[in-house]
Amino acid sequence: MQGLVFFLTSLLVFVFLFCALLPIASPRMTKPKMATKEVTYTYVALGDSLTEGVGDSTKQGGFVPILAQSLSNENDGQYQPVNYGVAGNTSAQILDRLKKQTDLQKDLKKARVMTLTVGGNDLRKVVVNHLSDFSLSDIQKPLKNYTANLKEIITKARKDNPHLPIYVVGIYNPLYLNFPELTSIQTAVDRWNETTEETIAQFDQVYFVPINDLLYKGIDGKMGVSEISDGKTTVINDALYEEDSFHPNNTGYEKMKQAILEKINATKKTWSQK
């Protein structure tokens, strides 16, 4: 019996000493999480009244700020918009600003992406000058001049940023619902957009965003809304600003934003690594 007690006592002492000699495992080292530094990208919006945001009841700049917000929400980093839209500008006037505005040049140098609305005032000027007898032949020379200006705008915008992705927004026909019989104007709009798309196809990472089909028939292409006053029926394009029936309203700008965003999402893999 004494032998058994001695044996058990010796065993307990041995186990205690063995455990005491074992190294104590140190806590697992965890790599501290580094605070991610949020990157800010510059988004340059250049153009005419569509870029300025005429018709936007919030006076915030039409599609520009909501596009920047969507880009920030869907990508890493924050997209900070700088709006260089001036209502009434033709392609020649936009080009002139591009040559002279040093702040615009500086922003383009560091820009991550650029949108361009151009051409609508060039065509509008032709239509106004030939309102009673407008024909497609009237746009030949202005379209040629516009094409030359568009090429130079793209080239100068990339002077210090050669891989800058540029999204050129097409023009639309705001007169269609009230003057559907003026088919020559719609044909001119189509031809203008086709020429724009053909012209920018000569450049790498310059993309065309068509918007005519989104706006010229009203929301969802439902031919607008009819209003009757003094026995006369007026068709209202519910995608356009009521005050002038020419520029997009908030809904119209939302549709523009979505079209540009979808084009960016479909093409950004070609430029996101540059």
Residue spans for each PLM region:
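Hydrophobic membrane-insertion alpha-helices, especially the h-region
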Residues: 6-22
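Serine-esterase "nucleophile elbow" of acetyl-processing enzymes
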Residues: 24-87, 104-106
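Structural recognition of the beta-strand scaffold that forms the well-ordered cores
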Residues: 42-46, 80-85, 112-117, 165-170, ...
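Surface-exposed cleft-lining segments at the edges of enzyme active sites
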Residues: 87, 130-145, 178-185
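Oxyanion-hole/transition-state-stabilizing segment in secreted/luminal serine hydrolases
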Residues: 96-141
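Substrate-gating cap/lid alpha-helix
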Residues: 174-213
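Mobile gating loops/cap/lid regions near enzyme active sites that modulate substrate access
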Residues: 206, 211-244
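Histidine-centered active-site loop/cap adjacent to the catalytic His
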Residues: 232-274
